Amino acid sequence: MVFVDRLLATLVHLRHGVTHDVLACWFGVDRSTVTRAIGEVRPLLAERGCTISPDVRLRTLAEVVDHLGATGKLGIIDGTEIRVRRPAAGRKDRDKFISGKNKQNAVKAMVFTDGDGRLLFCSPTRPGTCADITHARELGLVKLLADGPPVEILADAGYQGLGAQTGGRVVTPPHRKFKKNAPDWYEEMHERQRKAHSSRRIRVEHGIAHLKNWRALTRHLGRREHMDDTVQAIAGLLSQQQTADLILARQT
């Protein structure tokens, strides 16, 4: 297969979840040829990073924090789960992929968008048992925010505690001080603050929804070892589409 055909096969596989067998029939080649082609192109797409302008791409979390600090934009983070096949029977780590949230075999990725919902970064995946806040710490987000430029990052209650570790740069929903028998004035204030935070943070949910429109992330039926490249390749392609749409909108 020439490079254009290999690229096209990879894009169709990622966008529509078409199996290697079907792609082999379409291109008139052996299934192993398609598998090898996708295995070669997918890492190349993943290495491109997320496009924020025609000449600027963000490839690491440090670059994202620097970009937000330089532009003064708001950042939003959230974790998302992607269903995967259950590990084979007898494996000692078989249960670590079971999500405590959905009770399904899954891996987690941390998604980073700006205040407008534009995709800036999608992290490598972790097993479904890994908590969102643990994943953020493992990625070095706490140190990057504590030592980096002053930025504001919105997050949900799963990241409660990062605010104190980053000097207040991670903003989570207001903590409820009354467990029960709260005064009416407090209930109204807490609900108002919670809704205000949620209405700002919803943009990252939209970004995740756009990611999940790619069938390869609806449920991953391939090898889990390829998940990191798959997630980051799709994030890069989606961010490039968002940037192109934004440029076109400005020209019209």
Locations of regions flagged by a protein language model:
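Residue-level marker of regulatory loop/turn positions in helix-turn-helix DNA-binding domains and
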Residues: 1-2, 196
